[in-house]
Amino acid sequence: MTDDFRWIDAPQGRLYAQRWPRPADGAATPPAPILMLHDSLGCVALWREFPAELARATGRDVIAYDRAGFGRSAPAQAPLPADFIAAEARDSLPALQRGFGFAGFVALGHSVGGAMATACAAAQPEHCQALVTISAQAFVEARTLAGIRAAREAFARPDQFERLARHHGERARWVLDAWIDTWLDPAFAGWTLDATLAQVRCPALVLHGEHDEYGSPRHPARIVEGLAGPARMMLLPGCAHVPHREAKPAVLEALHGFLGAPAR
C-alpha cells in the first residue's frame, strides 16, 4: 500500500493532502472515500496511523488534509473568519474533490473537525453518503471553555508548546491563538451546530468519550437529536477527547460495522 501525497489548490491557498488507499479487492467500482477533518490543533501528521488502519478496517480510501494555516498547508488569515466552520465545506471540499477526482464521500471529523464534517454533509447531500463525528461540539458549553482555559495554561509551558511546534513549525503560535481566541471570544458564545444538523440527511455515527474534557455527553445527544437522517450515538466509556487513540479498537470496530465493509 503506497500513500499518495498531493498539493491541492483551494481559494484559501495550497492545501497539503494525503490519501491512504484501500486494500486491493478487485472491486470494479470502489466505495466512496472517507474524508477526514482534523481538530483545532491538528494536522495530517497528528492522525498518526489511524487513517491507514481506517482504510483497512472499512475497505475505503481515506483522504486527510491540513486546513489553511495548519501543518504543511499555506498560511491562513488571522483571526479566523466568523464562518470558518462552513468555509471548509464551501472552499476546501470542492478543491479536494477536484484534486483527488471523487464526488461521493464519507465525512469524518474530530472535535471542531466534526462540525466541519457536518457542514460538508449539509452542503452536499447528494454526495455525502455518511457522516461520522468524533468528540464534536454542538454548542459552546462551560466545560468546553474550562478545557480550553486549562489547555492555555498547559501550553504556556515551553515543553508543551514545543510539541505543537513540531507539527506546525513557526505557525504554532497562530494555531494555538486561533483556537483559544475564537472559542473564548464572547461573540462566539452563541454558536451552535443546530441549523447545519437539520440539513444532514445521510446516516450518521456520533462517537463521544464519556469523560471528554471539552464537551459533556450533551453534545452527541444534541447532534443525534438535530440530524434529519438516521443517527446513532456511541458513548465510549473511560475515554476523554481522543477516542480514536484512547479506544482505537472499539472505534475501528464501530466504523467497520457502520460503513459496511466486508470482513478482512
Where does each model-flagged region fall?
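Catalytic histidine-centered segment of alpha/beta-hydrolase-like enzymes
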Residues: 239-252
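Active-site loop/oxyanion-hole signature of alpha/beta-hydrolase fold enzymes
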Residues: 64-105
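Flexible "cap/lid" loop of the alpha/beta hydrolase fold
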Residues: 118-123, 127-159
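Acidic catalytic loop of the alpha/beta-hydrolase fold
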Residues: 211-215
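Conserved HGGG/HGGXW glycine-rich cap/lid loop of the alpha/beta-hydrolase fold
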Residues: 20-75
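Short beta-strand/loop motif that positions the catalytic acidic residue
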Residues: 200, 206-208
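Alpha/beta-hydrolase fold catalytic core
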Residues: 1-35, 59-60, 260-264
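Short alpha-helix in the alpha/beta-hydrolase fold that links the catalytic acid
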Residues: 202, 216-225
